[in-house]
A protein has these predicted regions:
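ATP-dependent carboxylate-amine ligase catalytic core
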Residues: 7, 21-23, 27, 31-41, ...
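Nucleotide phosphate-binding/pyrophosphate-handling subdomain across enzymes
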Residues: 44, 135, 140-145, 152-163, ...
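Hydrophobic anchor at the beta1->P-loop junction of P-loop NTPases
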Residues: 46-48
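Hydrophobic positions on the alpha1 helix immediately C-terminal to the Walker A/P-loop
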Residues: 56-60
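Internal gly/pro-rich beta-alpha loop/helix module
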Residues: 160-161, 174-189, 193-258, 264, ...
């Protein structure tokens, strides 16, 4: 008989070995284990789906709710360094020790009465974190969808307010080949009679149609809420509430106002259960933090960290980099999964980069540095790129970053 793990690290290894596939779309298995655990939330649940902007939206929701004095729980994925980053309670990352009892509870429910249910790594870990949050006496639970929406493990919980951020082409093998089919999957988090905030200014018709079909309370960008602004401040207007003279969100990037607008619409839609003051909105937006989203690290050379991983988010990254002004040389450390649409990503940011540092990543899904370099060469040649651009190969991200920093001048 297999020994039960006693540490978070042990449980994560256990989860990796349980299911034959990393991604297995379907809610039946997750819903069955959730039913066995009697998993439910007493507080309002806000679920966020979208191709890009999910993490930023969750961080803004959390920041404003904390400033309003609410006890918050947030589930996001993936993590950057440590698994525990996926769950925050009252603004703080939970401890590994706090997670272990909930992994034990999921396993007990999974194998209950010898009727074993197979769960993927994501499904198992999601259920463990949801159970922790459901036991935490929260005022609001904020859930970030992992992939799609309709069949995602987070959708085992009925949301009180759905937010759908930008929709673009990504994960086509699971979600469909175009924005309409991808939008339809993401709209699956909506619930009848409950607010559904769609902050994509060009939302696919499939999202609007689904909201109408099920009778969700659809809040559309441009119709039910909007924003305006100048270089100093911005304004927001919803169905019955307005905010004027807001400071720009502390998260950098032109796209963050769209995300912030959806967040404020959600708070207006939930105002009877989660009222927030104008001061909480101002303070929360000014103080929100999120690693890896156009994150500028203090010091020289200027170091920007960004987790852009599809053409849409790379386009936003490129626009944000371009807006930073002139730097003598731009160095790019780049690693990516093999299933990503790499050519348009490289083509978009390519004109801004002078030196590339392609890196392997410690996961089987990753594209090798050598293949990344080949794909960049092909894109570079087609575009008739500059001959003074160089590239190099590295075995891991730290080595690549160290090489880039060593080669850079302070003004780069």
């Amino acid at each position: 008989m297999q020994t039960k793990p006693h540490t978070l690290e042990g449980w994560l290894r256990h989860c990796e070995q349980l299911h034959p596939r990393n991604i297995d779309m379907g809610l039946d298995r997750v819903a069955e284990v959730a039913r066995r655990m009697a998993l439910r939330f007493e507080c309002p649940v806000i679920t966020v789906a979208g191709t890009n902007g999910k993490g930023s939206s969750c961080a803004m929701l959390e920041a404003v709710a904390l400033q309003a004095g609410y006890r918050t729980g947030v589930y996001t994925s993936p993590h950057l360094v440590h698994f525990e980053e996926r769950c925050r309670g009252h603004g703080e990352i939970v401890s590994a020790a706090d997670l272990v009892p909930h992994f034990e509870a999921v396993e007990a429910a999974r194998i209950q009465n010898g009727n074993e249910v197979s769960l993927t790594y994501f499904e198992f870990t999601t259920l463990a974190i949801l159970r922790l949050m459901s036991h935490a006496l929260l005022d609001v639970a904020i859930l970030e969808v992992g992939l799609g929406g309709r069949l995602d493990a987070t959708n085992a919980i009925d949301t009180d307010c759905a937010i759908i951020t930008s929709i673009d082409i990504d994960h086509t093998e699971f979600l469909g080949p175009d924005r309409e089919s991808i939008g339809r999957e993401k709209a699956g988090i909506m619930r009848t009679g409950r607010p559904a905030i769609v902050s994509d200014p060009m939302a696919p018709q499939s999202v609007v149609d689904h909201a109408r079909e099920i009778g969700a309370d659809l809040w559309s960008f441009g119709r039910d809420f909007n924003f305006s602004g100048d270089k100093q401040q911005w304004n927001w207007a919803g169905r019955g509430r307005r905010y004027a003279g807001l400071a720009y969100p502390s998260l950098r990037g032109a796209n963050q106002l769209v995300n912030a607008s959806g967040v404020l619409a959600a708070f207006e839609a939930l105002r009877e259960r989660l009222p927030v003051t104008a001061q909480a909105v101002r303070n929360g937006m000014a103080m929100v933090e999120l690693p890896g989203r156009f994150q500028i690290v203090p010091g020289q050379p200027t170091l920007v960290l960004d987790v852009a991983h599809n053409p849409h988010s790379v386009a936003a990254l490129t626009a944000n980099l371009d807006a930073m002004g002139f730097f003598p040389t731009t160095h790019a450390v780049f690693g990516a999964m093999a299933d990503k649409d790499l050519a348009p990503m490289l083509a978009k940011v390519g004109p801004l980069v002078d030196r590339w540092y392609f890196t392997d990543l410690p996961t089987p899904r990753a594209e090798s540095a050598a293949v990344l370099q080949q794909k960049w060469n092909a894109v570079h040649m087609v575009a008739g790129g500059r001959r003074d651009v160089t590239s190099s190969l590295h075995s891991d991200p730290l080595q690549a970053l160290q090489a880039a920093v060593a080669a850079a001048d302070p003004a780069d």
